[in-house]
Amino acid sequence: MNLIDCHERRPNNWGNHCGASRVAVAAYLGDTTQLARAAKVFKGYLGDRASYAGFVYGSDLSWQCDPSAPVGINPMNCTIGSSQVGGILPDDQRRAGPFSWPPPKENYVYEGLQGAMAEAVILKRAGYDPFNWENKALLRAFQWLQTQANFLATGDDTWLPHLVNYYYGKGTLPSTVPSRPGKNVGWTDWTLPPR
């Protein structure tokens, strides 16, 4: 599997890290065709199945809002029973097991968001608007982790809230200073001070 295959097949942390690498290469090379394709795939991951729906999901779809039309991030106002699941990254959350409430604190979700946020920043700098796509899907993912899962960023995920606060507004998420670098980005507490 190459970088493009990974990005276009894996709706989880692997696919998001591959997507971040893919858009970084395309942006660096000025390959607008590749960048446009990667943006469509990312928009599909965020929930716009009309943009892209070619992902291969794991067998457990119990965290999906609509198992017949799975997405990378559940849509706004989605519930399973009486539980609010809008904003979940279902293919990463499933790694903690089938749907249960209260939700398990599954770190793969943060790993998926590490790749997704890096991808979003590069796309933003290339002229796209990923932070607003699908009713601010990325923001909703972090809000779900904070409010529904009561799971704040720790360890190598602490750079993420600084990025969220930079793009969505100061104080959106509690942030740690100093933060730790993640798998693909770091030092956001220094490079992205509150605006």
Regions flagged by a language model, labelled:
Residues P104-K105, R125, D129-R195:
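CBM-like carbohydrate-recognition segments
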